[in-house]
Amino acid sequence: KPYQKIVNMIEDKVLQDDCNRIINSFLEKAEVVLAEVLQKREFANETRARLLAYSGEILMSHVMNYILKSSGIKSEVIPFDVWPIITDNNLESANFLASESSEKMAETEKLLENNDVLSIGGFIGKTVEGIETTYERGGSDRTAADLGILFSKKYHTRIDFEKDSAVLSADPRVVKEELESITSLSYNEARIAGMFGMKILDPIAIKEIVENGVEMPIIITDMGRPEKITTIERKPSEKNGH
């Protein structure tokens, strides 16, 4: 059980028991959805979104919340009943609805004001009617961008991504020598690079930021070498290697 290995890292017995109860409740929901899949012989639309949410993204956000709490961090999870990411009805390739999402931000802002860290599952949205939806590939990048858009109306906001690599001057799978680290990119440069194959950041995430008229830095940090950082801004202050 992969989740059990994580739960065992929580030293506080009360938090550990609470976390186990949450995991079991979500997995029970996932089992109900799986039964529907077997009955309908179809893994699509809201059934697909519900299973991905209950067995993965939303469940993991609750587990992360308990891990943070066990480390003494004042944290909370954003529950699905006050989910701030509202999308259209394209259930498997949803589109972010900024105006409708802004109307749902009050509870999330209240949680933020009372805590230091909030956890939320990526990739998942819901319609105005409350039906679960999913973004396409790269959806977690879009979730971060969408939250940045929503929070920027009230807070000074930036987005930090920890990735397998910061941005390089060429595809390291193709070019093996003389690769340079790119420290600065514009929104447009990053979006175009994504459209032509750069996998580090979903270009739709940047497109949504631009379309909503938001200016906030996007920081890409190499997890293995955290000194390697790329900053993406509307008007970058520095140019190198591109």
Enumerate the language-model features and the residues they cover.
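Core structural elements
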Residues: 21-39
